[in-house]
Amino acid sequence: MRHLWWPIAILGVRHRFGCTVKALLWLTIILACSVVLNAQEQHGLVVLEATGGKIRVTIVRHGQGADEVIEVRENEKWVPALTVNGFATHVIADTPGKLQDCSVESLSADQNASAIDIVSSCTAGRMQRTLSLTSEADVIAVRVRFTPKEGLAIHSVEDRYSFAPGRRAADTPVLGPVDFVWSQNIKTGPDSLIPQWDFKSPAVMLQQGSIFTALMPSLNARSQPPLSLDLDVTSESKPWISYGAVPSEPYGHSYFRRDSKSVISLESGGIEYSYAIVASSQPPKLGYRRIVRRLWQTLGHDGLLQSADLQQNVRRPSLATFDEWRQDAWMRYADEVYRRVDCPGGGCGTLSSNRNYLGQWDKPEEDAWFNAWFQSLRTAYGWYLYGERTQNTEIRRKAESVLALALKSPQQDGAFSTIYLVPSDRWIKEDGWAGFPDDYHTFCMSWTAYWMLKWAEDLTPNRKDEIVTFVRRYGDFLVSHQEPSGVIPSWFDSNLKPRSEFRELNGETAGSALFLIHLSEITREKTYADAGRRAMEFIGREVLPRQLWWDFETFKSCARKNFDFYDSVTAQYPQNNLSTMQAAMAYLELYRVSKQRRWLETGSNVLDYLLLTQQVWSPPYFDPKLLGGFTTQNTDAEWSDARQSYAAVLLLDYYQETGNVEYLERAVAAARATFAVAPWENWAHTGFQNEPGAMTGFHWGTGSAMTSVEIMSGKLGDAFVDVRRKHAVGFNGCTVKKLKISGNTILLDIEALPRLHELNIRFAGINQKVRYKLAVNGKDPIAIEGQELVRDGYIAKLLARN
């Protein structure tokens, strides 16, 4: 019976034991009718519910306004998720700006029982708001149009909802006011917000228990500012989320706040925006995965299919195919920055970043960086792969000389320096601008040691003993300094004492776990595996509950802040995605070693959280193609940062383990994204200026991106077909428009850049004992053995129309 009482309150009938049976019976009949009719006006009450749906909207006329309740179905009961008292849409107008009074003129459902229209008259104009059912069982589409009166200054129009489950009083690093909260950016004050400049994966989300809800803007190629999302967990009696036309202004690095003085341009005669309400019962703290899937389904997937030219450079359009990029990266750029280095025994070299470890950017130095950002070993790995592919002995020799230099880093009980200065023949422990130059940094050392092991496994097995000897000493250092909790401190001074910052809590521990688990695979020593597992158990216990992805970049990079910074308005901590990436990698390593599916499941959860920082569209107000790129953290605003090349390989690895084709598509988009903005590290670093970011060197741009392509192209070729899963994707300057698999016949329609005359198509899920028939772009099918497709792929000659 309690389930029926809340509409009584909404209708203004206060339930008491003395109320008449007639009143209760009347309300029960209304609710029964609303369920039968789905969307029907009954005495000022309208209910919108999809057949078999998970979401229901109830709107009741209340005085001059209309109260709303968005409910989700949980355990066969309807539970409130979002509420509105009076008016969902808030209009700020006049000078000075003030909230406008509105009055509902009509509230009605359409004849098909699929939409509700609310028409209101406001002191500043006329408003129509339409809520519609969709093909998705947990989604309501909302469209708002506000037509202002002539001569009035309109400052903002936005829809705001209260989160019905409310919040708890708790606010600790493992238990917050709500179980899950997410916005692209956090706040430094109550008037901060998330403008369209920050719409990488546009949504705001809240979850308490199993009740999950989100607002998702409906975007397209014509979407232009000012559009903004907002979220507040603690300032009012209940948390709220909002979306609408709200001007903003930038401040700090890099935040935005409401611009109360700005007036919205009315070129089209009115203000319009659309969005989706997503609400449903979801696994605790994991509702965001529903949004990750929907973001790609509604924006990313179609954008990828439409774009054959995602890797075409915005400033040098002659660079578009991977072979063109190979010439630019490996034959020109790498040769320009390569330097031979004198070292004991000889054979050392570097691909210089030409940075300054103290951040004195006007004083660049020839150097070698073995850093979590600028990882020379990884770039040299890609260069070596290119040398193998082209049978270029000189390139392989130069690439291996970078490994030789890294192995010369002086060790102190296993800890080692990660920056080498060529002119002064000097090793520096760590980055002095984004770290502490006199301290050893485990995040950078572990990433370097991991890539040393990759060299030993994949490229230079003849140096395996030398490499393992070096990294084993470092592995022993980590094991001996791991805290009982499982955390591995981030920084150690010259006496190998841990620094207080990040000593007891950090996300960088995941990077050390990744290395330790990989080391255990090679050495077969359980000590390293146990230490890596304990480290990831720490991540699961202390980091995941409130997504405390704290690494050096969170606090020590351009978006600087104190180590104790916390956004008490949205109840979110600052976080950065470098540690998130390495955590997803470490969970995957744990799964491969242990074969325990729980590690793969947790890793997939972490990967999906990481994907909230991937761009699912290319905004029309920026020049480059930005689909697939990654931003960095929730206190900065750049687009298509070079880290996306790291994420691309990670996504491909998860695709191979899970079979989730979305991961494959996202991997392709991420791998292409850097090339659109290279050689710069990113685009629109402050979020809103249509210009390239800084030039931070070969290893954070062209070189790092090309390395990912070399790693991935052996599996993906120029285009890739997974026969078992019946899915295909273009990788190099092409897109698969159509795939049809019938028995052993494979039909492909591929659109490619005009300059590509042939494509190497690679295959997975092939039965090697079967003969296939393969046809590309309408040509006659050819017969080809399955084992040949697996071994060599297929070279498709393209028609002149491409």
Language model features: what each stretch is:
Residues 5-6, 26:
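Tryptophan (W) side chains
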Residues 58-82, 481-485, 489, 520, ...:
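Short beta-strand segments and strand-loop junctions that repeat across beta-rich extracellular domains
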Residues 195, 202, 234-242, 247, ...:
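Glycan-recognition and catalytic cores of secretory/periplasmic carbohydrate-active enzymes
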Residues 37-39:
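Boundary at the C-terminal end of the N-terminal hydrophobic targeting segment
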Residues 64, 74-280:
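Beta-strand/loop-rich accessory regions of lumenal/periplasmic or secreted enzymes
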Residues 24-34:
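Bacterial N-terminal signal peptides
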Residues 729-802:
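C-terminal beta-sandwich/jelly-roll accessory domains of carbohydrate-active enzymes
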